[in-house]
UniProtKB/Swiss-Prot annotation:
Specifically methylates the pseudouridine at position 1915 (m3Psi1915) in 23S rRNA. SUPFAM superfamilies: alpha/beta knot (SSF75217). HAMAP family: 23SrRNA_methyltr_H (MF_00658). This is Ribosomal RNA large subunit methyltransferase H. It catalyses: pseudouridine(1915) in 23S rRNA + S-adenosyl-L-methionine = N(3)-methylpseudouridine(1915) in 23S rRNA + S-adenosyl-L-homocysteine + H(+). Its main location: cytoplasm. It comes from Aliarcobacter butzleri (strain RM4018) (Arcobacter butzleri). Its EC number is 2.1.1.177.
Amino acid sequence: MKINIYAILKPTADNFDQIIKEFIKMSSKYAKVEVHYIFNKNIAKAQTIGEKESQLAYSQTYEPLLKGYNIALDVLGKRVDTYAFSSLIDNKNEVNFFIGGAYGFQREFLNKCDSVISLSDLTMAHKVANVVLTEQIFRSLCIQNNHPYHK
């Protein structure tokens, strides 16, 4: 199984990255998990113009990556518990998670995804969302493989 996490974010090295890398390492027994931070010139320019332009730039950046089973993280997405989250990624060859930028996603992009979920009703920094997401991926893989971490 391959799991990709795509985030509209400038790459930085910080304590969050250490935690994310640790969850990726622990997950490697069950799946190949990779995080891809994307912040290109098109996105940077669009974010100085406004919301619609930014959402369009996010869509244009992400749409070529839509393959396998695609899950968008969106504030208006379905709230799921850990078991439902685990079911979303169970028995999939490739899963792609898409984290939007500051302005969220266009409705058209969300409609192209297989699932749209929310990690929480709380607003989180992108790095915090990545920590939560990588932990939930590891927890889900443990559930699927009867590993005691979840208990």
